[in-house]
Amino acid sequence: MAKTAILSNGNLNIGLNEFGLVSDFYFPDNGYENHTLGRDLFHRIGIKIGDEFSWLQNGDWQFSSEYFEDALISKTEAINNNLQIKITFTDFVVSDFDVFARKIRVQNLANYPREVQLFLHQNFAINSSFHLADTVQFLPLEDDEKAILHYRGKRAFIISAQKVGGDFNQKSFKDFDQHTVGLFGIEGKLGSWCDAEDGILSSSNVEHGQTDSVLGFNFSLGVFESADFQYSISCADDHQLALTNFQKMRDEGFSKALSETKKSWQKWLAPALRFSKKLDLKYQKKFIQSLMLVKSHLAKTGAPIASNDSEMLNYARDDYSYCWPRDALFAIWPLIRLGYRDEPQRFFTFCKNSLTPGGFMMHKYLPNGELGPSWHPYSQGGETRNLPIQIDESAGILFLFAQYYKKFRDNSILDEFYDDLVKPIADFLVDFCGENNLPKPNYELWEMDFLSTTYSTSVVFAALYSASNLAQQLNRARDAKKWRDQALKIRTSAQNELFNPENNYFYRGIWPNGEKDSKIDASSFYGAFIFNLFDFKGEKLHRAFNVLEKRFNVDSQIGLPRFESDVYYRFSDDYEANIWPITTLWRAEFYIARGEILKAKEILDWVSDQQTSTGILPEQIDPRDLKHLSVAPLTWSQAEYVSALLDLIASEE
């Protein structure tokens, strides 16, 4: 199920699916331990009127979604014309404590009064696992308050729901009328949600195993009348803290939490809003939405998570809830350009703590810094040995740190990270270059092949050249000379070895046997351009760009694929490859650099049109029908959109 909104405070991350239902539930860290596990494990919402019952996902509802202006607070409208009912959700994750909250309004669209029932269902696989039993209990609390507790060990989720009555001056709050708890996925049980369909919940008070629960409200609606409800899930790794958070949200605490969350986002967005005002009006909203989506994927450790969309678990063995240093470069870079200091600095601390003793980053990481799973082997077969790494990931971190220093000129930060991050990586990159002065074969940007690519060479060049400038700032003359000398050797060798005069494009790379790969790969051009491996004023970059556009027929299709014959998520042989927003935006960035703003805006407009109403961009787009493919949102796609618009602002200034 594609995501329509992401809500997060860095600890708690909620993904809402196309029906506005909770389908990803990460806690206590962004991207780590999804307690709904994707797949069919989502929280249901149902309405019963008379003899008719409808769950929101059953196909009878029409949906629209949007974010609040300048806050990661979503609004979803669901209309059922057959039932003549509308439900409006206002959803948010509280900014300063770990609660998912939603305001619910149920409106009668009929010109006659109705008796209505609202059912709110939740299920969890706590700690992302079915291996051990969860417990669910009905909680009868003091002062006639009621709640539902789901827990495993210390981890607790407390669910509360109230009907809101009264007027503006004196509101009243009434807890749910019905409840039940039960099992799903074992012993032939589908789930306690089935119990709601007859309108009467069985009031079961405890269960353990694979557990779920349902809350129910019974209420009347006059002609065109509405009823309001508030619902929350309070989360903690301590049962008492979960109760404390639950109490904070009771009664008037809900409105306060919504107000404070909105203020918190507006404060964080203040630097970005100043930039957005310099854009054409048509880009401003999408710019801010994309930036909020990037922020929503930053773990509390500082690690940018590639995507928290777990939909692909329906088809694949794993998801994207990891930190790839490759993606992190492009996620953090626009934050630096916008003037954000804290998030990049936390990420550099994450990198310093994750860096191997050899001075390189591994393939990918869990949000807490532990090593993530990898498909890169230590050997290419036979007696060969190699590191299971992508050299661009280590180089990218070094380049990014140099951009941070260039922006803020903070010598205390340079002192803090020089010996533990800058120098180890730079020395490793020098040692990793072969006799031809290019990086030795390694796993390339797209994580598939083992060779020395133009893209990786570009990042290593830029990283070493930037590192030499950092060394000069600290009067480390020996380091500065060593790193600059190697950078210049790389550039000279690249000029001789990596441009293919036969097709006027960059070689994708050089294989371990010395053979050169002529495949047209968008990253070869982009790396040479953005990391200044080839002179922007020279002919080769511009000739290569023309070849890239002609090869992928941009006159009839604005979007670019990654490379020729890309089969990843390609579901038919009747077309060559899917479109990637990332590579498409690279086209726009080059046009901006050339001063061809109208052409750049044509591309930016096309990418903007592919965004959802909440600004979400996927990893890939089917060129036949423009449907989103793979994960959505992809943090890199959102960040690249922000970066392209920042380029546009810079060009027009």
Describe these PLM feature segments.
Residues 89-92, 203-206, 215-221:
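Beta-strand-rich interaction surfaces with strong enrichment in secreted/lumenal proteins
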Residues 71-73, 237, 271-322, 357-389, ...:
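Extended glycan-interaction surfaces of carbohydrate-active proteins
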Residues 1-81, 157-195, 260-286:
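An extended acidic
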Residues 30-31, 35, 40-41, 48-87, ...:
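Non-catalytic C-terminal accessory modules of carbohydrate-active enzymes
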Residues 270-281, 292-296, 329-342, 382, ...:
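Well-ordered alpha-helical scaffold segments within catalytic/enzyme domains
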Residues 1, 77-79, 83-194, 213-215, ...:
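Polysaccharide-binding surfaces and accessory modules of carbohydrate-active proteins
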Residues 243-264, 282-289, 339-356, 411-429, ...:
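Extended, well-ordered alpha-helical scaffold segments
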Residues 65, 114, 219-239:
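Short Pro-Gly-centered flexible turn/kink motifs
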